[in-house]
Amino acid sequence: MEIFNVKLNDTSIRIIFCKTLSAFRTENTIVMLKGKAVSNGKPVSTEEIARVVEEKGVSEVIENLDGVFCILIYHFNDLLIGKSIQSGPALFYCKKNMDIFVSDKISDIKFLNPDMTFSLNITMAEHYLSGNRIATQESLITGIYKVNNGEFIKFNNQLKPVLLRDEFSITKKNNSTIDSIIDNIEMMRDNRKIALLFSGGLDSALIFHTLKESGNKFCAYHFFSDESDDSEKYFAKEYCSKYGVDFISVNKNINFNEKLYFNLNPNSPDEIPLIFEQTDEEGEGQPPIDDDLLYLCGHGGDHIFGQNPSELFGIDAYRSHGLMFMHKKIVEFSNLKGKRYKDIIFSNISAFINTSNGCSPAKQEHVSDMKLASAQFFATDYTGKINKLTPFLHKNIIQHYAGLPVFSLFNQHFDRYPVRYEAFQRFGSDIFWKKTKRSSSQLIFRILSGKKDELVNTIKQSGLIEILGINHIELESILYENTTTRLTMELPYILNLYRLAKFIQLQSIDYKG
């Protein structure tokens, strides 16, 4: 723990932080940083940021800062904290009188305030269970606040926060998803070799071809398990061979050992895996444990490009182009997803009646999905160095897809249609039109079946059933069906409930408040 005493408009403030954030201080300026900050295409240190702050001011810095980072800046009467657009190190703060506690870990905030009781934020828990990622700085723990991706927050001399910007208020640079992926990869490049986690699906294929086009050398890792379809591995291997890319397959299988959870220190339920995987070192390839590799993956593509767009897009289609166009898009969607036309129509009519003018439930759901994706994935090694990231979760791509109407994400035959078409036009490979991977639902059902007792016990012991007024009979019925018979529409709720229960357990949260 370190303490900096500063003044905001003659009011004395203490900044208390854990040493996981590297700090640089001059007489009038403090910069604390974790991750990799980039300005004008070049990495910058805390000292370099401080120098620009003193020469040009805080506003100039935050307008031109890119990368994957969280940051605190103090300069004379300005105190700001912020986070990059790209999913990166978390940043939390807690206020106590004229003290502000800052860390990238919720557990550190709790450790620095042993006399405070941190209880479950019931409202945020309900939003989490419903899948609604609302734009707020509140966390799941009362009294602890989070900085969301792309946000910069300024504090006045009473430590009242004011939001200066968020990820959806930033202007995108171009409309090309592929150009943005290239820019994002180049921004994060260092002297390490690149390893692509390549499944052979659309999202990893996008990164595969952008790496090839931009002249980056890389190897491809393909994970498989005893339950995998061998055709997926052979397809990925042959595809890499066709383009002269080294291919390494690694055998990973499910590990149901619940003790592994107690090695976690999660900041949110989304960081808690449904299951752990173990690597078989005697498989066809060695596990990717090389510290000199920067791993790229296609995580987030499903959410951002609209893998499962909200069926309430019909409201937007009707408002934009009329009744016949809405009919056409609903027919396309029902054919693509195998849903009943009548059900989609009824859900749109019901939502339309209960929706205010100008409100787009489909767009709200899509933006919520993108925020969920950008919050879920980011990894550093034990030194804090970035070792795994996804090039999709960045402002140009997020901004572009936030600006598209949901009904434009697909046509009758292909989901994620705009990105498939752009990639095919640019690279000429038919991989972008293929469904190369099997559905993950079989694997999820196997995991839930194997964890049935643990799932039930964790949820019951968390206290969530009582505190949130959950009907335990209905819950038991839903749990039974999803773990023994088939997956249902309640699957996302079940997964969120389990992760939230685990989060309460691992963070020792007083759910009773």
Swiss-Prot record:
<dbReference type="Pfam" id="PF00733">
    <property type="entry name" value="Asn_synthase"/>
</dbReference>
<comment type="function">
    <text>Along with McjB, necessary and sufficient to process the inactive microcin J25 (McjA) precursor into the active peptide.</text>
</comment>
<feature type="domain" description="Asparagine synthetase">
    <location>
        <begin position="176"/>
        <end position="436"/>
    </location>
</feature>
<keyword id="KW-0614">Plasmid</keyword>
<keyword id="KW-0045">Antibiotic biosynthesis</keyword>
<dbReference type="GO" id="GO:0004066">
    <property type="term" value="F:asparagine synthase (glutamine-hydrolyzing) activity"/>
</dbReference>
<dbReference type="GO" id="GO:0006529">
    <property type="term" value="P:asparagine biosynthetic process"/>
</dbReference>
<dbReference type="InterPro" id="IPR014729">
    <property type="entry name" value="Rossmann-like_a/b/a_fold"/>
</dbReference>
<dbReference type="GO" id="GO:0017000">
    <property type="term" value="P:antibiotic biosynthetic process"/>
</dbReference>
<protein>
    <recommendedName>
        <fullName>Microcin J25-processing protein McjC</fullName>
    </recommendedName>
</protein>
<dbReference type="GO" id="GO:0005737">
    <property type="term" value="C:cytoplasm"/>
</dbReference>
<keyword id="KW-0963">Cytoplasm</keyword>
<dbReference type="InterPro" id="IPR001962">
    <property type="entry name" value="Asn_synthase"/>
</dbReference>
